[in-house]
Structures are given as structure tokens and as C-alpha cells.
């Protein structure tokens, strides 16, 4: 199985998953990059997976379905183009892989991640929940939901690969360095991120550089407390403070 990022809009990645001469697209913001990829690689579209109902994630799904009407569109009931409604725990297959749907709200009140388990490990298509060195903004969800989604991700094996839908890594790492200026892993990752695409990323890597997965680290909590000017008594409070600090960070 081969997984390829296709660039779309300004900073979106549409993830294309190939098995034989069939492919899945994840979060098609627009149809044309997907169609060009399919033609160039002589592939048939087998499935489309949508994580949440924002135009830069579902905008191309309806057009792709019209072009490939045998191809199901998976998404929650608020995804207009969905032909196959999913909920937490829904399972289906693609190629030799097993797909499990997780509810990972926070960015939006209803947000799904697709966990693809293959012989070479777990691949998580996480939309706008987790970014490398960061997390999604809270729109219609809550920071409590987002924190819980991160806690669940953090229980996966450290070799799990995450496939976010945006390349925000360099900007996120600059904020991470603001929180942990003495973290050598962040400095190394930042230098690399300025030169090349960074995705996908392993959970092991994110545990070293993502402040939103490091809320129990004393240096992270102390820095957050210093910046917000109050005591933070739990991982959730640290997470929420970091999210507010990131919103204001320039």
C-alpha cells in the first residue's frame, strides 16, 4: 500500500492511498488534483473519506462521487456528500487493510479520524485534530473534547503514523520553541521543517516536539503558567492555556 500527499488550495494535503490499481482519497478539498492524480497513475477511485464538514475538506467529495458513482463517500451524517454514514467504531476495509473510525472532536463538534491498520502498522488520517507540533483550532467543538482526542491518540503505539490535512509544521514548531526554548528535538525539527515537507509523522516524534502532547512535562506546565499568569492544576488546564496562547501567537 502506498500513501501519497497531493497538494491542494494553499496548504492542504489530500492523502491518496493506493492498493493495486485502486485508490482512496482523504479530505478532497477540490476535485481537480485528485482527478489528475488518478489519471496520471492510471487508478480508479475506490473510496473517499471525509473527516469533518469544512469546505477545505469535503469541497470536492460530491464532484468526485458524480465522476465515480460506484465509489462510496464515507463521512458522518453532517457530510452532505456522504453515501455511507459512519459513526465511532464503524469498520470497513480497503485493499488488505482494516479501517476503524474514531470520534476525535474538538476542532469541530463532530470530527472523525480514520485508522488504517495494515501489515506495516497503523496509519491515522486525523484531519484537523492533530497537526505536527500542534492541534486544530477550536471552532464548533470544545477544548475539553480536543484534549480527550489527544489523550486517546497518545495511547496508540509510538510507531503509529499520523497524516494531518495541513502542512502547518514550521509555524507550529516556532510556537513549540516559544514554549520549550531548551528542547533540542524541537530545534532540530524546526530546521528540517523550513526546508522540506514534514508529513506524515510518528507518534514518537510528536511526543518529543508537540506541546499539546507534553502537558504533563513540568517545563511545559511552568512555562504556560508564566505566560498566562496563573496556576494550572491539570493536563487539561495546561492544554487549554496552550491553545489560547497559540491563538494569540505571532
Curated annotation (Swiss-Prot):
Name of this protein: Hydroxyacylglutathione hydrolase
Protein family (similarity comment): Belongs to the metallo-beta-lactamase superfamily. Glyoxalase II family.
EC number: 3.1.2.6
Single GO term (MF): metal ion binding
Described purpose of this protein according to its UniProt entry: Thiolesterase that catalyzes the hydrolysis of S-D-lactoyl-glutathione to form glutathione and D-lactic acid.
Gene (name only): gloB
SMART domains: Lactamase_B (SM00849)
Bound cofactor: record note: Binds 2 Zn(2+) ions per subunit.
Domain of life according to the entry: Bacteria
Organism classification: Bacteria, Pseudomonadati, Pseudomonadota, Betaproteobacteria, Neisseriales
Amino acid at each position: 500500500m502506498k500513501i501519497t500527499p497531493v497538494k491542494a488550495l494553499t496548504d492542504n494535503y489530500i492523502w491518496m492511498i493506493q492498493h493495486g490499481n485502486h485508490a482512496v482519497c482523504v479530505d478532497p478539498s477540490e476535485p481537480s488534483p485528485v482527478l489528475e492524480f488518478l489519471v496520471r497513475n492510471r487508478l480508479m477511485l475506490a473510496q473517499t473519506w471525509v473527516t469533518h464538514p469544512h469546505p477545505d475538506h469535503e469541497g470536492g467529495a460530491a464532484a468526485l462521487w458524480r465522476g465515480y458513482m460506484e465509489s462510496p463517500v464515507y463521512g458522518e451524517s453532517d457530510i452532505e456528500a456522504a453515501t455511507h454514514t459512519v459513526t465511532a467504531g464503524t469498520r470497513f476495509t480497503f485493499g488488505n487493510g482494516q479501517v476503524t473510525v474514531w470520534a476525535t472532536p474538538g476542532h469541530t463538534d463532530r470530527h472523525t479520524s480514520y485508522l488504517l491498520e495494515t501489515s506495516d502498522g497503523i496509519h491515522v488520517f486525523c484531519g484537523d485534530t492533530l497537526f505536527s507540533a500542534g492541534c486544530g483550532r477550536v471552532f464548533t467543538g470544545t477544548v475539553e473534547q480536543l484534549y480527550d482526542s489527544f489523550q486517546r491518540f497518545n495511547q496508540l503505539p509510538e510507531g503509529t503514523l499520523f497524516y494531518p490535512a495541513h502542512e502547518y509544521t514550521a509555524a507550529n514548531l516556532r510556537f513549540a520553541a516559544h514554549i520549550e526554548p531548551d528542547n533540542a528535538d524541537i530545534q532540530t525539527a524546526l530546521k528540517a521543517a523550513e526546508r522540506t515537507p514534514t508529513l506524515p509523522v510518528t507518534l514518537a516524534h510528536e511526543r518529543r516536539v508537540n506541546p499539546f502532547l507534553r502537558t504533563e512535562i513540568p517545563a511545559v506546565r511552568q512555562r504556560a503558567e508564566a505566560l498566562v499568569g496563573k496556576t494550572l492544576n491539570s493536563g487539561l488546564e495546561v492544554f487549554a492555556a496552550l491553545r489560547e496562547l497559540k491563538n494569540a501567537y505571532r
